[in-house]
């Protein structure tokens, strides 16, 4: 099989060699990470040490941003716990040393969140434009992150523009939304030229969605053979994703709900669902990683406790709640694997 590492690597090599479309054997994924990787190849050659070094630096910087976020929303103790938990989380460290976009998306998630809470403190023209461009990169990295957009709009309206007059609001929305949407154009054009049709950044959405939304789905992992067997057994080949879901809900609503429950269960527990690689192979063959934090359930449990304890200050943590719910849904609505959970 052709793994995602190879596709990102080949697309990056082609971009560094002059192919502005960064084509690869499989072009179904959002091309942003290929351009990030290709820029490194262009500057340093196909140097994996440069790639991993930059991704490790982004991880370290993300830890600092998490400290600042925790301190800003709660206090320095919470900030330090967030810093320590993220910087010593073995799964994140593993993905920082791999040519996959998991750590890249995680960094953009953290930076975009930090930019938004800073925007509330200093909503200058430069901050509005900068925040919009950071959000644009976050959304383009994986389109299911667009689930956050309605809540971002609500946050800006309710908390950033709260005391602004009508004319100021109009100007503010222009400074925020125009750069946000205009910055989508280059990648949308790239996707159109590569696929010969309009593609909203990522054409893998339908298969990623159906592969995790059939009644026999175990709740974790990605296996198209299981999906094909189910479709053939129930004569559901060739259906659109919505029709595929509708027929299952109508024929076995209880079974469909049980499948959703399994996905939620496996999302919050310790099992690291394999996708392109197994986290457990790295843990077994490393002398350091097993001594770091390697239990996702620890983070999910602390996160759920934090939600309950901070509910009285929900205005202060509105954006945190919104990001948390949207990032959980961005995984659970599709399929649950290790690398999708990190952000």
Summary of predicted features, one role per range:
Residues 1-11, 24-36, 45-49, 198-202, ...:
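Extracytoplasmic catalytic/substrate-binding loops of multi-pass membrane glycan-assembly enzymes
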Residues 3, 28, 32-33, 51-58, ...:
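Multi-pass, polyprenyl lipid-linked donor-dependent membrane glycosyltransferases
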Residues 17-20, 223-307:
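Lumenal/periplasmic acceptor-binding loop at the mouth of the active site in multi-pass
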Residues 53-74, 110-111, 115, 301-308:
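Transmembrane-helix motifs of polytopic, lipid-linked glycan transferases
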Residues 61-88, 106-107, 121-128, 314-322:
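Transmembrane-helix signature of polytopic, membrane-embedded enzymes
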Residues 76, 112-130, 138, 156-164, ...:
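Membrane-interface transmembrane helices that cradle and orient dolichyl/undecaprenyl
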Residues 118-120, 126, 148-181, 188-189:
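Perimembrane helix-loop-helix junctions
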